[in-house]
């Protein structure tokens, strides 16, 4: 009899998997490229930091206007085609920015990055779940690690180039060349069928009843919005809160985000192992959202340097360590025939939150920074409530195989 502890994490589609993970590594670079090269680009386009901030906003716009479109395309024409579209858009950006003559064209290239991210998400997430049908949670949570590694590596590259007076453009051309290599690998790679093999499907939880879009579907989307908002609020406002209420200096307060990043990476690797062997994504989502809720309450009630540093680490672990990705995995289990559409809807709502939350927190900051932490607690609590709803519905919709001993 098969046991979960012997679950294989191998796949015959290894080249496709490498392409996807490597693309996410470079995607992590792409979303911070403009900010990391802000001074050089401001000089190039004869603008100021506000002008580059406007340029960066094009990434969010590109993502919002395209993600639903690519969800349909991915389900209809396949994952490879959509990922190739993403790579082409990334190539336009990385090779185009150094040669771009003005800010208007550069904004168009920033929009290309947002479009590329939409295409990569709607092709990459479903493809990983199809490559690893028995370990989809572990497969998608590693996406978070690859993005984080890219965002850790690129600032070091930019710093090295600045210290050695190397032209900033090489910092864009190098990722562009790597995307050329990914293109060649994609053309030779093999992708799985969008339908799970019957022999594999029999070992997975079987549907006992039809999932309800208005209940677990809506709850899953709300979970994604709440989870995203929980860590977004902390990463933007924790330093200011720590300075105002914990008496920390600016330099000390900024270090809270380093603890946040460490927590995020620690969670990714812990749960990548646990999800493969003994823990279901739905269990991980309930646990992490409960932990985030408790932590946000403690940060509000007992602000101190220790609490702010430890709280940032725990929020990074619980809210930014991959539960956004696990939410996609769980929602795709409920609606397996529309994985890319599910991903696009889920990620689009996160994009809307990315637009709305800064407006809300900006307003609250004028009233009192403590109310921003109250808002963060509210989002964490919403994530917990929706995670519990999805958890309870999971066992009504699915029949769990007797030989499956995963907790949750």
Residue ranges with predicted function:
Residues 65-101:
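Conserved MFS/SLC helix-loop-helix module at the cytosolic interface between two early adjacent transmembrane helices
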Residues 34-35, 213-266:
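Extracytoplasmic gate region of multi-pass secondary transporters
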Residues 281-326:
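C-terminal transmembrane helical hairpin of 12-TM major facilitator-type secondary transporters
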Residues 333-369, 376:
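A late C-terminal transmembrane helix in Major Facilitator Superfamily
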Residues 109-145:
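Cytoplasmic helix-loop-helix junction between adjacent transmembrane helices
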Residues 119-132, 321-335:
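Intracellular juxtamembrane helix-capping segments at the cytosolic ends
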Residues 66-78, 267-280, 365:
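Helix-to-loop junctions at the C-terminal end of transmembrane segments
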Residues 134-135, 139-191:
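Helix-loop-helix hairpin linking two adjacent transmembrane segments in secondary transporters
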């Amino acid at each position: 009899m098969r046991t979960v502890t012997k679950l294989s994490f191998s796949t015959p589609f290894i080249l496709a998997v490498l392409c996807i993970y490597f693309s996410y590594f470079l995607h992590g670079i792409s979303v911070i490229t403009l900010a990391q090269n802000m001074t050089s680009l401001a000089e190039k386009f004869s603008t100021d930091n506000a002008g580059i901030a406007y340029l960066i906003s094009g990434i969010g716009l590109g993502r919002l206007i395209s993600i639903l479109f690519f969800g349909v395309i991915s389900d209809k024409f396949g994952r490879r085609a959509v990922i190739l579209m993403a790579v082409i858009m990334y190539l336009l950006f990385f090779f185009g920015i150094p040669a771009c003559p003005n800010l208007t064209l550069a904004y168009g290239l920033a929009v290309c990055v947002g479009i590329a991210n939409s295409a990569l998400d709607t092709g990459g997430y479903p493809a990983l779940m199809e490559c690893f049908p028995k370990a989809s949670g572990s497969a998608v949570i590693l996406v978070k690690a690859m993005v984080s590694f890219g965002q850790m590596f690129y600032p070091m590259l930019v710093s090295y180039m600045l210290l050695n007076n190397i032209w900033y453009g090489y910092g864009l051309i190098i990722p562009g060349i790597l995307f050329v290599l990914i293109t060649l690998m994609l053309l030779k790679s093999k992708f799985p069928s969008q339908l799970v093999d019957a022999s594999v499907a029999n070992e997975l939880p079987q549907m006992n009843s039809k999932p309800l879009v208005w209940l677990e579907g809506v709850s899953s989307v709300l979970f994604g919005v709440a989870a995203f908002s929980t860590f977004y609020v902390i990463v933007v406002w924790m330093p200011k809160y720590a300075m105002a209420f914990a008496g920390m200096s600016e330099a000390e307060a900024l270090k809270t985000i380093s603890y946040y990043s460490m927590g995020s990476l620690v969670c990714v690797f812990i749960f990548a192992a646990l999800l493969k062997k003994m823990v279901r994504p739905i269990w991980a989502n309930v646990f992490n959202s409960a932990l985030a809720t408790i932590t946000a309450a403690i940060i509000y009630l007992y602000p101190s340097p220790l609490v702010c540093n430890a709280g940032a680490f725990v929020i990074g672990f619980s809210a930014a360590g991959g539960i956004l990705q696990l939410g996609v995995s769980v929602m795709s289990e409920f609606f397996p025939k529309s994985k890319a559409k599910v991903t696009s809807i889920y990620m689009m709502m996160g994009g809307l939150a990315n637009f709305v939350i800064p407006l809300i927190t900006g307003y609250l900051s004028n009233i009192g920074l403590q109310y921003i932490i109250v808002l963060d607690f509210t989002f964490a609590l919403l994530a917990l409530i929706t995670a519990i709803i999805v958890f309870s519905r999971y066992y009504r919709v699915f029949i769990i195989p007797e030989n499956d001993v995963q907790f949750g």
